[in-house]
Amino acid sequence: MEVLAKHRFARTSAQKARLVADQIRGLPVSKALEILTFSPKKAAVLVKKVLDSAIANAEHNEGADIDELRVGAVFVDEGPTMKRIMPRAKGRADRIMKRTSHITVVVADR
């Protein structure tokens, strides 16, 4: 049994979120939550929320035992980019790219 949860349009770049996602792939959920709780990265908070949601989905919808769950797959895809203008000297302008990402966590029983 596999259960997934998604956070779409997360306000962090996919590159930064993948650093966190790579740390928890394949781990038991208790160990993954421990790693995410003590990680100093902003993306760790976002990934932890998605993991908590996936665990709750597995428990509520499938009746799964939390102690038996593992992080099956974690992937982070790029979302749309918001483009902003930063005025510069001599009438020029630079683009500011506000990147978003789609975080998906799949938990499965052993």
From Swiss-Prot:
Instruction: Please name the GO terms of the biological process aspect recorded for this protein, alphabetically.
Output: translation
The reply to whether Aminoacyl-tRNA synthetase figures as a keyword in the UniProt entry is no
> Which controlled-vocabulary keywords does the entry list?
Ribonucleoprotein, Ribosomal protein, RNA-binding, rRNA-binding
Domain of life of the source: Bacteria
One function term, GO molecular function aspect: rRNA binding
Matches recorded under CDD domains: Ribosomal_L22 (cd00336)
Q: Which InterPro entries match?
A: Ribosomal_uL22 (IPR001063), Ribosomal_uL22_bac/chlpt-type (IPR005727), Ribosomal_uL22_bac/org-type (IPR047867), Ribosomal_uL22_CS (IPR018260), Ribosomal_uL22_sf (IPR036394)
Secretion signal, residue range per the UniProt entry? none
Listed under GO cellular component are: cytosolic large ribosomal subunit
- Protein task: This protein binds specifically to 23S rRNA; its binding is stimulated by other ribosomal proteins, e.g. L4, L17, and L20. It is important during the early stages of 50S assembly. It makes multiple contacts with different domains of the 23S rRNA in the assembled 50S subunit and ribosome. The globular domain of the protein is located near the polypeptide exit tunnel on the outside of the subunit, while an extended beta-hairpin is found that lines the wall of the exit tunnel in the center of the 70S ribosome.
Record's family? Answer: Belongs to the universal ribosomal protein uL22 family.
What PANTHER family does the annotation carry? CHLOROPLAST 50S RIBOSOMAL PROTEIN L22-RELATED, LARGE RIBOSOMAL SUBUNIT PROTEIN UL22M
* Subunit record text: Part of the 50S ribosomal subunit.
* Name of the protein this chain belongs to: Large ribosomal subunit protein uL22
